[in-house]
Amino acid sequence: MSPLKIHGPIRIRSMQTGITKWKEGSFEVVEKENKVSLVVHYNTGGIPRIFQLSHNIKNVVLRPSGAKQSRLMLTLQDNSFLSIDKVPSKDAEEMRLFLDAVHQNRLNAAMKPSQGSGSFGAILGSRTSQKETNRQLSYSDNQVSSKRGSLETKDDTPFRKVLGNPSRGSIKAAAGNGVTPARTIPSLTSTSTPLRSGLLENRTEKRKRMLSSGSELNEDYPKENDSSSNNKAMTDPSRKYLTSSREKQLSLKQSEENRTSGLLPLQSSSFYGSRTAAKDYSPGSTNLDRTNISSQTPSAKRSLGFLPQPAPLSVKKLRCNQDYTGWNKPRVPLSSHQQQQLQGFSNLGNTCYMNAILQSLFSLQSFANDLLKQGIPWKKIPLNALIRRFAHLLVKKDICNSETKKDLLKKVKNAISATAERFSGYMQNDAHEFLSQCLDQLKEDMEKLNKTWKIEPVPGEENSPDISATRVYTCPVITNLEFEVQHSIICKVCGEIIPKREQFNDLSIDLPRRKKPLPPRSIQDSLDLFFRAEELEYSCEKCGGKCALVRHKFNRLPRILILHLKRYSFNVALSLNNKIGQQVIIPRYLTLSSHCTENTKPPFNLGWSAQMAVSRPLKASQMVNSCITSPSTPSKNFTFKSKTSLALSLDSDSEDELKRSVALSHRLCEMSGSEQQQEDLEKDSKSCRIEPDKSELENSGFDGMSEEELLAAVLEISKREASPSLSHEDDDKPTSSPDTGFAEDDIQEMPENPDSVETEKPKTITEPDPASFTEITKDCDENKENKTPEGSQGEVDWLQQYDMEREREEQELQQALAQSLQEQEAWEQKEDDDLKRATELSLQEFNNSFVDSLGSDEDSGNEDVLDMEYTEAEAEELKRNAETGNLPHSYRLISVVSHIGSTSSSGHYISDVYDIKKQAWFTYNDLEVSKIQEASVQSDRDRSGYIFFYMHKEIFDELLETEKNSQALNLEVGKTTRQVS
């Protein structure tokens, strides 16, 4: 195997394309136009990617990878990263030596402009000489002394021949002077001064020497080393290993005949054919004018050398600009690279349920816009809050590397696990349960944020109650996913109607019982089945009737309707949950027209925000969130309070701002005092302790105070504000200080364990215990009451007691830290064991159920669930609407989460989503992303579809039209820019 062409799995990382998947292929080093390049070929075919190596290598690393195998990692100057794995160690080492030589020549390029090509020729030639006869190797070994002597002299004639024509003939001459094999050449090129001096000649002299020495070399050396071959082709080191000696001799004979006759058929066809071949214009390629070299035959490539100076239309023009930094600027990728830009999420250990749900939520463009584009103050939100972790992952998912993305995924999982412990391990979980938990937690975080802004000051604005009261941020869950259903209970005796309203984030619908003669039922049938009228036992307060009828209608529609299809049934005899594999048709459109009234409110338009509803912000917020928050929940649990008001006031020299800060502190003290009086009457002493101070400040006023007195007052009030917080429990505090924004700084934050706050709690132990302060104060008071002398003995006793307390606290701290470390290690070990056990069980159950993964085609088993019956006209209208969406209140399919497996307790989740920006469907299977047709989604997921996302047709059309206009505008701007340039 040629050391300059190695094979193995390849992965490439660049700023433009991200990180690609491991693909089988090869690295091939070629030299062309005195530039060394790396050509990446994939076994699956396609356009090879070409990376310039000359003056472009940043780092080369070789690591072991299995028995007698290695992984070669190459980093370029633009931070592009290339890896090839499972390469034989010998070949990988030779490739590394060559790349190191290229890298070292880059360092000396300023003083030795021609050193690069010269040393490359010496290296490549010496490598070639290893494949010569043993006579040459023994001859080289016997010339050690002469080699050293030649290196000490300044006679550079042999090396000029190397520069002129780095063929085997020239290397043989160099071997006569003692040049060692390939593995020792890199050190010589970097340390030998005579070698460097021998390389100092300009390109014109080299070309003349190459042309003049051709006939001499033909007479002195074997035919396969004939220097009359293409100079340009023979400077390419990799081509010397493409064919055997026999093939080389045949090709050279043919070239000799062509040159003698004056005809160049191979040259013309290969050269001009290569111009029409596909070129690699990918952003990661630095040589845009390189052709597909591997597609040419050796004879065709060698025949190029007979042209004195080949001049394709763009080679010489682009060659001068190869080092121009503008080539590395991000460009709009072609359609062939769209799939490389899309990256999935790594499976952290049975977390396919989380990956599928997150991909579906992130694909909702209106949901993402409401989360990211309303100016939410992320620095005010704790680091471990789900909404902050969620938004951070949404922003970084398409631009960060896989390791960073995996870390962000862990933080999202930890944020949810902190509230719902069932998601903390690595066991399999239900995707619908995760979706419900995620949406509820996002709602709570937004409510906490809005409550925080009611009491937090707004820097730069006047301190008026109206401004703080009207600052409301839009909850993306409420505006996009939440809807309201009105249940009307109608007494069948007197007709009394009792309305009740309920908010939902999604609907869990039953599978309709399929009748054998009829075709399969659809999602539309299941939805209509949910809203059918039903009878129930109900005691009427007006007439005493015991029977009533319940009707369900939409009171407010969502932008996106989420439908959860109940694909499970409970087997009473076996006490097992079974998955139902019944076929259910997935329509492109479904309609809610039969479940709406004339009073039904349409979805929020895309321009709506909570700030527009400032006339009644509190009522609206309480109404839509009434189903989530219990009234008994203390308000202090909803405040993400960042105590920065003091810092804000001290940073300004304005007296008005100081007054405003003091007034704010007063209001906070009053609020905290009133809460304490209402909760516990026995704590009146604390509030009374604050009241005299407030009255004194109020009576004294601020007009007559100097700036220093105002600062002192602010500091005093701030200290009193902070004193009650010492008695609060740790869970009332935010898990971490929200002092960084997710978009810029979170990616650089120190490693942390967001799922617990144990790492932060020891910090509070170092502070003096409040109990110790109480005891010390009590002793001091007793000394005062008993009139203890204030001599040195009292001071010594006090200091001894304080030292004893501090020593005891330090011991407790050390014990707590040791215990915490032990518990952490035990928890990590248990977590690893759980992961291994869960993975084994998951694989075992999945393999057992894979044969039956298509499920059964029987009835749903829900005997009380009847099939919907339509008239012939209604059925025809619904069938037509499923393709066109012409009926009012129609919704368009945009995502499907599917469960693969025959049982409800094990399996695998995948997600199909419609990308509005690319106007195409994609399948996300953990880390793998593939393009799929909508018809395939509808047909392939009819037995496994579990959760369905439908977007209101008008909202969908508006988003699609906006995206098309944006793309058209970008194209027009691009054309104008190119015309101007």
UniProtKB/Swiss-Prot annotation:
The listed location of motif D-box 2 is 96-105
Annotated positions of the Phosphoserine modification: S114, S170, S212, S630, S652, S654, S772
The molecular function terms in GO held by this entry are: cysteine-type deubiquitinase activity; cysteine-type endopeptidase activity; protein kinase binding
Q: Which GO terms describe its cellular component?
A: chromosome; cytosol; nucleus
Q: Which residues form the active site?
A: C352 (nucleophile), H908 (proton acceptor)
**SMART domains from the UniProt entry:** UIM
Q: Where is this motif: KEN box 3?
A: 784-786
Its UniProt entry gives the catalysed reaction(s) as: Thiol-dependent hydrolysis of ester, thioester, amide, peptide and isopeptide bonds formed by the C-terminal Gly of ubiquitin (a 76-residue protein attached to proteins as an intracellular targeting signal)
Sorted alphabetically, which keywords does the UniProt record give? Cell cycle, Cell division, Chromosome, Hydrolase, Mitosis, Nucleus, Phosphoprotein, Protease, Repeat, Thiol protease, Ubl conjugation, Ubl conjugation pathway
Q: Coiled-coil annotation: which residues? A: none
Q: Where is the composition biased (Polar residues)?
A: 135-148, 283-300
Task: Write down the Pfam families for this protein, in alphabetical order.
Answer: UCH, UCH_N, UIM
Q: Which residues form the USP domain?
A: 343-953
- Motif (KEN box 2) spans which residues? 223-225
User: Modified after translation how?
Assistant: Polyubiquitinated via 'Lys-11'-linked ubiquitin by the APC(CDH1) complex during late mitosis, leading to its degradation. Able to mediate auto-deubiquitination. Phosphorylated at Ser-630 by CDK2 during G1/S phase but not during mitosis; phosphorylation at Ser-630 is required for deubiquitinase activity. Also polyubiquitinated during early G1 phase, without leading to degradation. Phosphorylated at Ser-114 by ATM following DNA damage, which in turn increases its deubiquitination activity towards BLM.
Q: Which stretches are tagged as biased composition: Low complexity? A: 183-200
Where are the residues of the annotated region Disordered? 111-306, 670-705, 721-797
Signal sequence coordinates: none
* Function according to Swiss-Prot or TrEMBL: Deubiquitinase that plays a role in different processes including cell cycle regulation, DNA replication or DNA damage response. Antagonizes the anaphase-promoting complex (APC/C) during G1/S transition by mediating deubiquitination of cyclin-A (CCNA1 and CCNA2), thereby promoting S phase entry. Specifically mediates deubiquitination of 'Lys-11'-linked polyubiquitin chains, a specific ubiquitin-linkage type mediated by the APC/C complex.
Q: Which family does it belong to?
A: Belongs to the peptidase C19 family.
Q: How does it assemble?
A: Interacts with FZR1/CDH1. Interacts with CDT1.
What protein is this chain from? Ubiquitin carboxyl-terminal hydrolase 37
